[in-house]
């Protein structure tokens, strides 16, 4: 059914519905899945300059396949407190501030495969509580994709959570076979091609980055692991980061700021991090010094293989 959101026409999907955008079709509007299940959004058509491309809230079993989103003012796809989201063969291009690619808040059982994201903010971001969404973020798989961040992060995990309950977790997350084409961010607090920066009493654990190729960093960091209290976005520090694997990572960038690993205090630390087969400019890394990491306090059990 159709509804008016501001000055924009929006299609609101019902349960057990397929929306098909035929190749050559251009929709100047958005698609919304709110409290529905078993929805498919298919085809090779385009969403052109929506305020937000596709919104999925309080829903389950939503498939997006083949769509192109051009110049979304905000998220290309956002997920909130939803499960069973699958996104395949999606292309996204955006140029304005805050125009993230795929952001998921308190979502579980998410599969992203074969997407191309060229965004002027985070390409992929995973959070727990934000806005009116509550709960953990777990079992997220991102495969065979290309990320190009004009600004901010190609991959961002953490940041937002729930300090009132203090028990939300981001876990069982895999990024595999990913090409990162660009990372350009002036502010060091928001740098990192692969970033885990937990705040708001979040805990991030059991996360793997594997077979990641970074082609260029105009300004930024390769890795950014941090338990933080960002006064702009958080109401408390994160709980910790642990059991993280970086395997088969290569980067050919020559102008890279030092990566960062930093805990918050003795009870909110970073621990058990593995760097395996990391290759920078053709040279396999054998030490933290060669990896160019600024290792600060409250960090334990860092291994290089």
Please name every model-derived segment.
Residues 1-6, 11:
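Single conserved hydrophobic/aromatic residue that forms the stacking wall/gate
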Residues 6-8, 16, 22, 28, ...:
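Surface-exposed or flexible loop/turn and strand-edge residues in extracellular/cell-surface modules
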Residues 12-14, 34-35, 57-58:
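Flexible, charged surface loops at secondary-structure boundaries
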Residues 18, 37-47, 60-71, 83-94, ...:
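Right-handed parallel beta-helix
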Residues 21-22, 42, 197:
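Short His-Asn-centered micro-motif
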Residues 48-55, 71-75, 95-103, 119-134, ...:
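Extracellular beta-strand/beta-solenoid scaffold signature
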Residues 184-305:
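Extracellular beta-rich repeat passengers
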